[in-house]
């Protein structure tokens, strides 16, 4: 091996290894201090891209969970108010049944009507004041809203809140009253027992309800028989002996067309659309119709509560899934970006030893030019 003075190759080699060991040691110290394996793109360019995409997805999942929880809170608020609406309707139904009792005087029915009015006002107050974050929920203004419950576009669920005011069209239906008045002697005869009710539903489909009344039934028995044959209409009799029929507004897009021999005898006429806010129980006939109207309103409210309950369960399951996906993404991101302390401390000790060795060797290499002086003596 040549002995030179101008170029100390051994020292240069030792210096290079010392620099490499120092660089690797600094990298290990940075990873241990930050807790991250990737601190800049030079550490792992591909891994950094993947990690950033995973973190973006996880942030989106966090927002989606908050959105779903907001949706649940809105539905819980609305459903709680509708529970009280159901209680009010139950009480109004009780008052209607009580007013239909023949033992009540006109003054008694007027007192019951006053309570009906107060309950109706409270029902509307609940519908108008129930809100979430300043947004009205049950007065018909909420309509339909989209809740983003996913980390990407297009992962939204539509939630609609219906109008719970007592004057809502869904809170009532069409009432019909027979022009003919049946006295105590009136009976269904063999020649007058056919009653066909034709109507078109909200989807445009034609329906026919065919009733073949029992010969010998009086008007009250006829109403009971009709109620037993179909659940689409509700039949009752007023204090004048007139048959009354009621069909919920959601069942039909128009009025009922009556046909048949019994229909011709009774001469059923539509009296108009009747909702909860127009109920009058000061007469037996009105009290009887009120029961049918309130039953329709209760079915409407309960049906919407069921829809909201199903959506709440859906949102809860969505949150569970989002949490599970977030957990798996976090685990994957950790494997890519986070520091493995067991591995990195081993690497640090290794580089520290190499640094010390390289420093020692560099010191020895620097002494080699002194050999030239020994040759010159």
Curated annotation (Swiss-Prot):
Keyword flag Coiled coil: yes
Entry-linked InterPro entries: Flagellin (IPR001492), Flagellin_C (IPR046358), Flagellin_C_sub2 (IPR042187), Flagellin_hook_IN_motif (IPR010810), Flagellin_N (IPR001029)
One GO MF term attached to the UniProt entry: structural molecule activity
Family designation: Belongs to the bacterial flagellin family.
Assembly: Heteromer of multiple flagellin subunits including FlaA, FlaB, FlaC, FlaD and possibly FlaE.
Entry's Gene Ontology cellular component terms: bacterial-type flagellum; extracellular region
Domain of life: Bacteria
Coiled coil location: 97-130, 300-337
Pfam families given in the database record: Flagellin_C (PF00700), Flagellin_IN (PF07196), Flagellin_N (PF00669)
Keywords recorded for this protein, A-Z: Bacterial flagellum, Coiled coil, Secreted, Virulence
Role according to the record: Flagellin is the subunit protein which polymerizes to form the filaments of bacterial flagella. FlaE is not essential for flagellar synthesis and motility. May have a role in virulence unrelated to motility.
Localization annotation: Secreted; Bacterial flagellum
Predominant cellular place of this UniProt entry's protein: secreted
Protein known as: Probable flagellin E
Record's signal peptide: none
């Amino acid at each position: 091996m040549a002995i030179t003075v101008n170029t100390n190759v051994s020292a240069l080699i030792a210096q290079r290894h010392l620099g490499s060991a120092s660089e690797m040691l600094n990298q290990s110290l940075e990873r241990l201090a930050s807790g991250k394996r990737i601190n800049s793109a030079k550490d792992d360019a591909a891994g950094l891209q993947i990690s950033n995409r995973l973190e973006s997805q996880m942030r989106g999942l966090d927002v989606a969970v908050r959105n779903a929880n907001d949706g649940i809170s809105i539905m819980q608020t609305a459903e709680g108010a509708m529970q009280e609406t159901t209680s009010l309707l139950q009480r109004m139904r009780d008052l209607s049944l009580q007013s239909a009792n023949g033992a009540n005087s006109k003054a008694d029915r007027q007192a019951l009507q006053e309570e009906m009015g107060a309950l109706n006002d409270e029902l509307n107050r609940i519908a108008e004041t129930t809100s979430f974050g300043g947004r009205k929920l049950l007065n018909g203004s909420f309509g339909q809203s989209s809740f983003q419950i996913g980390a990407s576009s297009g992962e939204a669920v539509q939630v609609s809140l219906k109008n719970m005011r007592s004057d809502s069209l869904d809170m009532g239906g069409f009432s019909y009253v027979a022009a003919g008045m049946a006295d105590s002697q009136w009976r269904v005869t063999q020649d007058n027992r056919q009653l066909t009710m034709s109507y078109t539903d909200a989807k445009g489909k034609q329906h026919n309800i065919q009733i073949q009344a029992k010969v010998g039934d009086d008007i009250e028995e006829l109403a009971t028989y009709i109620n037993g044959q179909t659940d689409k209409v509700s039949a009752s009799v007023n204090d004048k002996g007139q048959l009354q029929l009621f069909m919920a507004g959601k069942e039909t897009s128009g009025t009922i067309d009556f046909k048949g021999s019994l229909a011709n005898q009774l001469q059923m006429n539509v009296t108009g659309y009747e909702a909860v806010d127009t109920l009058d129980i000061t007469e037996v006939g009105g009290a009887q119709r009120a029961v049918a109207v309130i039953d329709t309103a209760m079915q409407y409210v309960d049906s919407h509560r069921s829809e909201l309950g199903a959506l709440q369960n859906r949102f809860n399951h969505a949150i569970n899934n989002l949490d599970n996906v977030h957990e798996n993404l976090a685990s994957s991101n950790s494997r890519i970006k986070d520091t493995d302390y067991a591995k990195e401390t081993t690497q640090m000790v290794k580089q520290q030893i190499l640094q010390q060795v390289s420093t020692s060797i560099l010191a020895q290499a620097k002494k080699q030019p002194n050999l030239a002086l020994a040759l010159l003596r």
